[in-house]
Every structure is written in structure tokens, then in C-alpha cells.
Amino acid sequence: MKPAARRKARKLAVQAIYSWQLSQNSFSDIEAQFLTENDTSKVDVDYFLELVRGVGGHYRTLDEALEPFLDRPIKELDPIELAVLRLAAYELRERVDVPYKVAINEAIELAKSFGADESHRFVNGVLDKAVDTFRPTRQ
């Protein structure tokens, strides 16, 4: 699949994760909503589903892994920053085929697109400190 299709999958996945965080609807409902309400013709739908289901199934573990690198409790994070961090943490931990620099850069770009003015700096700082936990060999 083309990198642009993966980028679009990440973008849609962050929005879905954000929606879940605020609504607490089931991930299957969120998936269905996003797949029916968005043009997915140029989206890697399988990757979108993997990201949403992966974060949904492992968010507690991902949060625990991220917490040592945060400057405040996880429940005090901006919801979009949390969604971006969870997605990036999942990619870093589970998708070793994705180079860590790509996962971090994509997260920074998502934070720039959806977050507050300085969100991308915060996301970059957290992931830069956390990368060795998720990718000890920095592949």
C-alpha cells in the first residue's frame, strides 16, 4: 500500500480514537461510523482497522508505557494529544515494519494537523524519550 494511503489511515484512526475517548462508544460502533461517513477510497482501510482495534485492545498497556515520559497524569492530557500518542505508541510497539522515525514523524504531523499550537512539540518530546522503551534497537 502507498505511504499516502497509510497516512490517511493514521489520520482517520486518530480521529476515531479521539471520538472513542470522548464518547466511550464501542470501537466497533466507531469503526462503522468512520467507514460509512468518510471517503475511504484512498485510505488503507485494513491499516485503519488495525490501528483502531490495536489501540482499543491495548490502550491501558500503551498508557502505562507512556506514563513515565509524561509531565502530567495521562487523564490531564489534551484528548487529541492522547489519541496521537496512543496511536504512535501502538505503531512503535506492534508494527516493527514501520521505521521508528516514520512513526514519530507521522505522529508529529498528526499533532500539527489536529492539536493545539505546541502539541507537536509535546508529542515529539514524549515519543523521543519513549522510543527506546518501544524500540530498544531503534529500528
From Swiss-Prot:
It holds the Pfam family NusB. Keywords: RNA-binding, Transcription, Transcription antitermination, Transcription regulation. InterPro entries: NusB-like_sf (IPR035926), NusB_fam (IPR011605), NusB_RsmB_TIM44 (IPR006027). GO terms for molecular function: RNA binding. GO terms for cellular component: cytosol. SUPFAM superfamilies: NusB-like. The keyword RNA-binding applies. GO terms for biological process: DNA-templated transcription termination; transcription antitermination. Involved in transcription antitermination. Required for transcription of ribosomal RNA (rRNA) genes. Binds specifically to the boxA antiterminator sequence of the ribosomal RNA (rrn) operons. This is Transcription antitermination protein NusB. It comes from Idiomarina loihiensis (strain ATCC BAA-735 / DSM 15497 / L2-TR).
